[in-house]
Amino acid sequence: MYDVIVIGAGVTGCSIARELARKERQILVLEASSDICEGTSKANSGIVHAGHDAMPGSLKARLNVRGNQMMGELAQKLQFPYRQNGSLILCFEEENKGKLQELYERGIQNGVQGLQILTQEELRKMEPNLTDNAVAALYAPTGGIVCPFSLTIAMAENAAENGVLFQRNQRVTAIEVMEKGYRVHAADENVYEAAIIINAAGVHADEIHNMLPAKEGHQEMHLIARKGEYCLYDKKAGALVDKTIFQLPGKYGKGILVTPTVHGNLLIGPTAVDIPDKNGVNTTGEGLETVMEKASVSVKKLPPAKQIITSFAGIRAHHESDDFVIEESKGYAGFIDVAGIESPGLTSAPAIGEYVAQLVNEIQALPDNKDFKETRQGIVHMEQADFEEKQKLIAQNPAYANMICRCESISEGEILDAIHRPVGATTVDGVKRRTRAGMGRCQGGFCSPKVVTILSRELGVPMEEIRKSDQDSVMLYGDTK
């Protein structure tokens, strides 16, 4: 029997697993998909929010600010890309300046540092490419940007290095209550037992919650699937803005943003549409037109559409309380929900890990893990290495001299590292998220066949068994001759 089973290997589940590993406990993470970071964590804005938007006193407010404070040190310890570029919330009408003041005061209540309301002139000096229609803005210098894949993967790898076991392709199908603990049924008729269950299943967390019969203290949960569509521009467009540019938030979120990414691209989006299908991550012509139209409100001129290298959609889980739901069930001891983790969930993830670990430690008193490793060595990227480092890497392994992805300058050595790391890549998208091979201008048109070949060789399976992402994403069916 495990001490804890975490259901879901997104950024929330991986952050929780890492924090739980600070104690001497047996931890298992079950992930329904073929890899970690396959749900909401892979399709979002990559923003480290300052914390002025959430209502004071809410879990969102508390954990957003704490997560923001943790991010810089974590980025150094776990070696994932992060930049504190600051954010601006634009106001376009004189009569709405009062709403900026409300956000400012809310941020002060939440403990956000350095907030300023900028005049139109100050705004122009800071961001010359913004529209002339912006009359004022709230500036949050503690806002930032992060790579959501790298953050999630870093958390998972560090958790694994500290003894956490990850099982992928293990969709949970049922949960039984035992006399002491829970029995979890998963794919391939696998059965796991644990004293404590952490439900971090993202948009499917309500389904996991509802696997336990409703009774006093454990009512049925319902999450709303809210879809957001994005456009990602080539790195040529990445310098359009330096700060993350928001518009005044509305009922469904923070509106359409314009932001650089930590890798130098330009990102615009998302829309916010409630949909019935939790797996409905298709993009639509209408949605992408909305993104470009509304992003154009913030900047003088968007780059031409031909510089868009990809578009994508993600689903976030919205709870009717408009807050995170993080609590032990009052009807089932040791069953902890971590649900409704929408924006600012990415920012809050490290703090959610701390918060949930405190809940678990109150239930389950165990000694400290004296061998806990705080740091993680990231993948060394040839593009970022200096000449001497490149020579050293190639001398150690000639695969570093074999360039696989031309757009992002990713070598075979980096791909090998991604495959053979803890919780390593087993799919083409898994390699992409760990190395950026396939993330560039051609979107894998050149390197994907080579990545398939490398995965097949290193994993010892036929190329026909290599998938793009999940089990049904077949890439090759057989020989043509």
What are these regions (language model features)?
Residues 253, 262-263, 274, 279-403, ...:
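C-terminal catalytic lobe of FAD-dependent flavoproteins
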Residues 2-29:
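N-terminal Rossmann-like FAD-binding beta1-loop-alpha1 element of flavoenzymes
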Residues 15, 175-180, 184-269, 273-284, ...:
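Flavin-dependent oxidoreductases
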Residues 138-196:
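Helical element adjacent to the flavin cofactor pocket in flavoenzyme catalytic cores
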Residues 46-126, 255-256:
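Dinucleotide-binding Rossmann-like beta1-alpha1 core, especially the glycine-rich loop
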Residues 55, 62-65, 90-99, 138-157, ...:
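Short beta-strand to alpha-helix junction loop
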Residues 21-43:
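Glycine-rich FAD pyrophosphate-binding loop
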Residues 279, 411-422, 445-463:
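Iron-sulfur (Fe-S) cluster-binding segments and ferredoxin-like electron-carrier domains
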